[in-house]
């Protein structure tokens, strides 16, 4: 009896995940950012992060200009607007440092590592699985591009251990 329950539960979970992936694929396009979407990315950053953490307009646009391939966005097909984004900066360095947030000149196109800079989803789209899909797709894509590591930093207050 317990085995049947476990199998049914797992089957339902798998179907729900499959349905969620299908819904996300229908509603959202996951792709590289376009230059004309820079203003939307800046606005999203300002909505999703407090002022002292948000990337400035200047730095965001500089990153988009220099390393657009390291931006992955979720574009709502119904509205044509960005719902979420994930961005990083490739480098051969192994240690994350704060300068990656503000100096797009540290970008090394053939870098073996990606410093993960930002993951954000607009509040009205949160809870739909967009962030998970962005992370999964970003990791898959960068692995295909030969990256060895994705390196994340987080404020202590946001990652209780």
PLM features: residue spans?
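A short beta-loop-alpha structural element at the N-terminal edge
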Residues: 27-41
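Conserved acyl-donor/pantetheine-binding loop and adjacent beta-alpha core of acyl/acetyltransferases
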Residues: 81, 85-119, 126
